[in-house]
């Protein structure tokens, strides 16, 4: 979240708390009127303040047989602030939250049924198989980072002649978002160790100490890198990824380089972790499975084209060396929705 969107989101939260009518405002979008009926109205928002864009779509509820919404980021400590906005969700048949710890307080703010929908990844694009490019990048530290860990890795990389990749500019836009994701996948498929910490690990003033699983875990495992970092202290983390999927270290870890050198003494374990992560992404965390959860909530099923993608994902998973039939996903149990067929 950049500073402008941060200020906008906070301002709307405060206004909606004291002025309920804010929830009926159109923030400036061109008004659209649905002129025919649809089977499903699907809305995906990053923040609760984005819900105001619904006011720019006339007759969306009357014209759509079912309606499902996804809210990526809503922290439990913020639910009371957005009660005015939450009433916009009452018309949905189901609401999915990307923060599992927020389900209980949200259920008290909205009458809409709600459940957890974890982040996902384009597992087919990120999969390193069958090509298996050489992992020439020693460490990839993407996005928010600990200055302590970063300084330690810089010195370690200089001393040992390792390749340490990290962000050097603060960019909020991309020339081409599809090319950006393609390049990210290419980097991770060539990375040995990928740093992943609990979502917004360094912004406790936003999370109020709530620990959630962020996108980095899904991207890193899908690309076959070994995850290193601070996982969220939540009971469902292992149900999402399985045991021994990452090397837990403090978010602030000045001697991480030495830890990585010690891990390299057991290449067999690292290879098992890599293949477990890739297999897990292909069978549990591709966006196909998230979309299937959305459709299930609406009483709908996947298209034949989506089923073809499922077959391709299973075919890639078979290349990891473990029979697909022996890998049973308990993701849907963690998400509190039925397991996909």
Predicted features, each with a name:
Residues 60-74:
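Active-site proximal beta-strand in glycosyltransferases
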Residues 73, 119-122, 251-254:
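Short, acidic/turn-prone active-site loops that include or flank metal/cofactor-
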Residues 173-176, 209, 245, 266, ...:
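Generic anion/oxyanion-binding catalytic loop in active/binding sites
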């Amino acid at each position: 979240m950049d500073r402008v969107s941060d200020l906008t989101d906070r301002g709307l939260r405060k206004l909606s708390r004291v002025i309920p009518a804010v929830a009926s405002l159109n923030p400036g979008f061109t008004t659209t009127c649905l002129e025919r009926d649809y089977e499903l109205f699907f809305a995906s928002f990053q923040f609760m303040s984005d819900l105001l864009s619904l006011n720019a779509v006339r007759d969306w509820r009357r014209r759509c047989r079912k309606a499902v919404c996804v809210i990526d980021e809503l922290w439990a400590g913020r639910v009371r602030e957005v009660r005015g906005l939450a009433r916009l969700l009452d018309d949905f048949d189901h609401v999915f939250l990307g923060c599992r710890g927020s389900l209980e307080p949200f259920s008290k703010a909205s009458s809409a049924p709600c459940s957890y929908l974890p982040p996902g990844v384009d597992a087919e694009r990120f999969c390193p198989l069958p090509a298996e490019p050489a992992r020439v990048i020693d460490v990839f530290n993407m996005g928010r980072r600990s200055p302590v860990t970063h300084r330690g890795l810089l010195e370690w990389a200089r001393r040992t002649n390792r390749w340490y990749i990290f962000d050097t500019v603060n960019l909020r836009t991309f020339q081409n978002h599809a090319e950006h994701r393609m390049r990210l996948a290419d980097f991770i498929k060539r990375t040995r160790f990928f740093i992943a910490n609990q979502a917004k690990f360094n912004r406790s003033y936003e999370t109020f100490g709530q620990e959630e699983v962020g996108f980095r875990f899904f991207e890193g495992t899908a690309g076959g890198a070994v995850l290193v970092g601070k996982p969220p202290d939540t009971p469902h983390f292992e149900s999402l990824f399985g045991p021994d999927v990452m090397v837990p270290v403090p978010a602030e870890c000045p001697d991480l380089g030495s830890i990585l050198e010690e891990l390299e003494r057991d290449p067999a374990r690292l290879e098992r972790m890599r293949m477990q992560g890739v297999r897990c992404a292909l069978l549990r965390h591709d966006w196909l499975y998230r979309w299937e959860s959305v459709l299930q909530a609406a009483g709908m099923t996947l298209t034949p084209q989506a089923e073809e993608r499922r077959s391709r994902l299973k075919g890639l998973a078979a290349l990891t060396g473990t029979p697909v039939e022996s890998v049973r996903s308990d993701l849907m149990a963690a998400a509190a929705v039925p397991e996909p067929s």
